[in-house]
Amino acid sequence: MSLSMYQASVPVLIHNLKALAGILKKGADHARARGIDPAVLVDARLFPDMFPLARQVQIATDMAKGGAARLAGVEIPSFPDTEASFPELQERIARTIAFLKSITPAQLEGSEQRAVNLQMRMGAVSFTGQYYLLSWVMPNVYFHVTTAYNILRHNGVELGKWDFLGKAPGANIKAGKPAKKPAKKRAPRKA
């Protein structure tokens, strides 16, 4: 089985951003239900030297749109990093998803060998497209989505693993009662 660069990127990025949107919705609902100023959660951090929730969302969306654009050879949409509320963060995610949906499989054909050159604080970095996607873009998206999840969970938002995983488009999950665990056999009692 071969997996195309498109299959390994665009649908997976969209899936993760939809999960992030669901996580943020639960954060906003939590704040509303408990009378918490939503800005407290949007500005929350896990530790003082870490980025706040808003910045985690900005970086996750920047990585997603930047990764797809570089692999497709198109201009990266520029979003100012000014979001300060849950609705603004949701809008940023929606704009990123809309951009990702504009990328076609044909645009990513052959991108596994495309040169991707980035200028970072540590200096210039060069990747092949495949290495860039699998070792830079995807781990960064997962990291920042996970950190957003952790910030909200740390602040009491009721989130679970399924919130992070999101609704898997190819999965056939049937809701209902969990399967019963088999009863343990007990050794006969000695008299």
Where are these regions (language model features)?
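Alpha-helical scaffold segments that form or flank carboxylate-/histidine-based iron centers
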Residues: 2-15, 37-60, 80-89, 121-140, ...
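Structural signal for well-ordered, non-membrane alpha-helices
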Residues: 17, 21-28, 65-68, 94-101, ...
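Helix-loop segments that flank and shape redox-cofactor active sites
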Residues: 23-51, 67-81
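Conserved alpha-helical segments that form or flank metal/cofactor-binding pockets of metalloenzymes
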Residues: 49-76, 96-104
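A structural boundary/capping signal
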Residues: 71-77, 101-121, 125, 129, ...
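Mid-length scaffold segments of soluble, non-membrane domains
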Residues: 88-95, 104-107
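C-terminal or internal capping secondary-structure element at the end of a domain, subdomain, or sheet
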Residues: 130, 134-174
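Intrinsically disordered, polybasic Lys/Arg-rich low-complexity tracts
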Residues: 173-191
